[in-house]
A protein has these predicted regions:
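Core segments of cupin and vicinal oxygen chelate
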Residues: 2, 13-62, 98-121, 130, ...
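Vicinal oxygen chelate
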Residues: 7-15, 58-65, 79-96
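A cross-kingdom feature marking solvent-exposed beta-strand/loop segments within repeated
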Residues: 36-46, 74-78, 84-86
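Ordered, amphipathic secondary-structure segments that act as subunit-interaction surfaces
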Residues: 64-72
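Short, charged/polar, Gly/Pro-enriched secondary-structure boundary elements
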Residues: 77, 131-136
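Acidic/histidine-enriched, glycine/proline-rich intrinsically disordered or flexible terminal extensions
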Residues: 135, 139-155
């Protein structure tokens, strides 16, 4: 089971990333990394199979626990209308497949993954417990160098 000490961000999903950055940044005294646009982010869901979406994401520079803001298309895991609370925690995991499978065995639902089960779910999975409006993003540690570089961009 993942360790709470490995949480590295709290994420929210929004309709307008620039508006959210301005509102939240000014109110909470946060500065931001450059927004990254993922034009072909691969997702897999049990319902739709494998598909691609366009997604934008940004992190607060302040940490070590960062705020992540995501904007994505309607009908996806990044749609605030589907996940009205729009909140998740991001946790580093060494073995994404094992951690995802353990949560599934405990009754959690797989909302989306970055790859198919045959591909060990890629590098991220979004998981929800059976009875709560809460999402955990399991993030493979092999993404850590990319995230660390992103957090330093523009400094």
């Amino acid at each position: 089971m993942f360790e709470m000490q490995r949480i590295f961000h709290t994420g929210i999903v929004v309709d307008d990333i620039e508006k959210a950055k301005a509102e939240i940044g000014a109110s909470l005294n946060l500065t931001w990394t450059p927004v990254r646009v993922f034009d072909s982010l691969v997702l897999w869901t049990p319902e739709r199979g494998l598909f691609e979406i366009r997604n934008k994401a940004d992190y607060s520079r302040q940490g070590p626990h960062h705020l992540e803001i995501c904007e994505g298309p309607k009908g996806s895991v990044y749609d605030p209308a589907i996940l009205p609370h729009g909140r998740h925690i991001g946790v580093w995991v060494d073995d994404l497949r094992q951690e995802t499978d353990e949560l599934l065995e405990n009754g959690w639902r797989l909302l989306a993954a970055n790859g198919t089960p045959d591909d060990d779910y890629g590098v991220i999975t979004y998981m929800a417990p059976p009875t709560a409006a809460f999402v955990v993003e399991l993030v493979a540690t092999k993404l850590k160098p990319m995230i660390d570089t992103w957090l330093l961009e523009g400094c």
